[in-house]
């Protein structure tokens, strides 16, 4: 773990020098991709997962892993590597649900379908889909067809109607249409009509794409 911690500290020092007096969430853009040491981080991360056991570390000791996963939110290489190590993935998901950084949570939520323990994956999904962060919850909803297809219609209706993320509601509704299409729900036609009534441009474009696919032979 020491090698990985050293690489994480190098990244932190670079970010502090490059963006003084700013915290990660306030910098904006794809600033993390400007770091030239990611290959060393990736190598140290994979080495740690291969050589060490998550149960040998406390939550505080593993906090740097969550931090660096969150910072790799553009390429998602660390999250993908983590998802290929099931025991580690479960441990870090538990930690992520208690963390304050949504950039780690959405990456893990979007990889739940790859878990070997489907019961555990569904438990995580129920937590992530109700996450207070809009994007985390939306990415979790998109996992629903693979893990809990029988819950898609209920959650699609909830996402469509809820107003806790009013400024992002259009995207919430696009996700609802997507999952209804994925499970071939008989409710899809009703929600396509609702999209037309809504009238917002991205939502209309999403509905049009779905309608186009439904008109193809064999659809």
Annotate each language-model stretch with its function.
Residues 1-115, 119:
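Extended repeat-based scaffolds of very large eukaryotic assembly and lipid-transport proteins
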Residues 168-219:
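Alpha-helical oligomerization segments
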Residues 53-65, 85-98, 117-130, 149-163, ...:
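Amphipathic alpha-helical scaffolding segments comprising HEAT/armadillo-like alpha-solenoid repeats
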Residues 70, 82-86, 112-117, 144, ...:
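Alpha-solenoid repeat junctions
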Residues 79, 94, 108-110, 126, ...:
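Hydrophobic core positions within HEAT/HEAT-like alpha-solenoid repeats
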Residues 5, 75-76, 106-107, 137-139, ...:
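Alpha-solenoid HEAT/ARM repeat scaffold
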Residues 100-101, 132-134, 164-169, 199-201:
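Short inter-helical turns and helix N-cap capping residues of alpha-solenoid HEAT/ARM repeat scaffolds
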Residues 131-149:
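Histidine/lysine/aspartate-rich catalytic loop segments that bind and position anionic ligands
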């Amino acid at each position: 773990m020491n090698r990985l911690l050293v690489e994480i500290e190098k990244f932190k020092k670079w970010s502090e020098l490059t963006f003084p007096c700013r915290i990660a969430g306030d910098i904006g853009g794809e600033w993390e991709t400007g770091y030239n040491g990611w290959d060393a981080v990736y190598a140290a991360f994979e080495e740690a997962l291969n050589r060490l056991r998550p149960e040998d570390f406390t939550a505080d000791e593993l906090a740097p892993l969550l931090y660096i996963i969150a910072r790799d939110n553009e390429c998602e290489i660390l999250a993908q590597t983590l998802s290929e190590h099931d025991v580690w993935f479960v441990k870090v998901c538990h930690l992520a649900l208690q963390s304050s950084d949504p950039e780690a949570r959405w990456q893990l939520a979007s990889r739940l379908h790859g878990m070997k323990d489907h019961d555990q994956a569904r438990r995580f999904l129920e937590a992530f889909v109700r996450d207070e962060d809009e994007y985390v919850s939306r990415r979790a909803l998109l996992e629903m067809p693979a893990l809990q297809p029988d819950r898609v219609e209920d959650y699609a209706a909830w996402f469509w109607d809820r107003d806790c993320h009013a400024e992002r509601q259009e995207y919430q509704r696009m996700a609802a249409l997507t999952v209804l299409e994925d499970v071939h729900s008989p409710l899809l036609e009703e929600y396509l009509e609702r999209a037309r009534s809504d009238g917002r441009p991205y939502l209309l474009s999403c509905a049009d794409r779905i309608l186009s696919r439904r008109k193809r032979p064999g659809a």
